[in-house]
């Protein structure tokens, strides 16, 4: 089974995370950042992963450190769970609508970390959550998982809907990229390595 766990304890955060690629969409997520908890629930359900997170952080300052460190831990767990990446599809993409919003996520599990994000959120906050932290989370996820991640919000007027579409599309695209394809023999690259 492709799964991994991470523990991260710093002066800013205390995180325990368990991630299973071949799961059933089961989420057990407890964080001090309610909006992020909601988004990770959606990511897990729509990616058909299993994800358990217990995260505490210095949210009395703001949500930055907790959100960033969850991205770090999830990226590291994903990279470990993928192992040598033999037989995976490697690429994944998804369009997801959420009412008036439309998001697109495209992934290459290439060992070449990069985030390209095009999203113009109308609101700086959703509740108490700073919307700029979506980029921070996705960048740390891409960096630690060593994936090329492109995120485009084509349009939308409600910031919550736009971000929700991103996280659902992220789950669906990652599910596709991590899928074992019986036609793929060995590493999915003409170089023979990723």
From Swiss-Prot:
Q: Which UniProt keywords apply?
A: Amino-acid biosynthesis, Cytoplasm, Histidine biosynthesis, Lyase
- Assigned GO CC terms: cytoplasm
Cellular localization per UniProt: Cytoplasm
Keyword Transmembrane helix found:
no
The answer to whether keyword Lipid biosynthesis applies is: no
Q: In which pathway does it act?
A: Amino-acid biosynthesis; L-histidine biosynthesis; L-histidine from 5-phospho-alpha-D-ribose 1-diphosphate: step 6/9
UniProt catalytic activity: D-erythro-1-(imidazol-4-yl)glycerol 3-phosphate = 3-(imidazol-4-yl)-2-oxopropyl phosphate + H2O
| Taxonomic superkingdom | Bacteria
For this chain, the family text in UniProt reads: Belongs to the imidazoleglycerol-phosphate dehydratase family.
What is the name of this protein?
Imidazoleglycerol-phosphate dehydratase
Q: Source taxonomy lineage?
A: Bacteria, Bacillati, Bacillota, Bacilli, Bacillales
């Amino acid at each position: 089974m492709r799964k991994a766990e991470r523990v991260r304890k710093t002066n800013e955060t205390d995180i325990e995370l368990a991630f299973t690629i071949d799961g059933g969409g089961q989420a057990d997520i407890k964080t001090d950042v309610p909006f992020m908890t909601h988004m990770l629930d959606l990511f897990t359900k729509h990616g058909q992963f299993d994800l358990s997170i217990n995260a505490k952080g210095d949210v009395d300052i703001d949500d930055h450190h907790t959100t960033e460190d969850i991205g770090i831990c999830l990226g590291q767990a994903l990279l470990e769970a993928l192992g040598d990446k033999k037989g995976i599809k490697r690429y994944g993409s998804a369009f997801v609508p959420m009412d008036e919003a439309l998001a697109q996520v495209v992934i290459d599990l290439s060992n070449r970390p990069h985030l390209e994000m095009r999203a113009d959120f109308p609101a700086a906050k959703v509740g108490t959550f700073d919307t700029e932290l979506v980029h921070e989370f996705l960048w740390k996820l891409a960096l630690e998982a060593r994936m090329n991640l492109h995120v485009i919000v084509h349009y939308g007027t409600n910031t919550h809907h736009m971000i929700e579409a991103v996280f659902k599309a992220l789950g669906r695209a990652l599910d596709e990229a991590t899928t074992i394809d019986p036609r793929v023999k060995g590493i999915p690259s003409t170089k023979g390595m990723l």
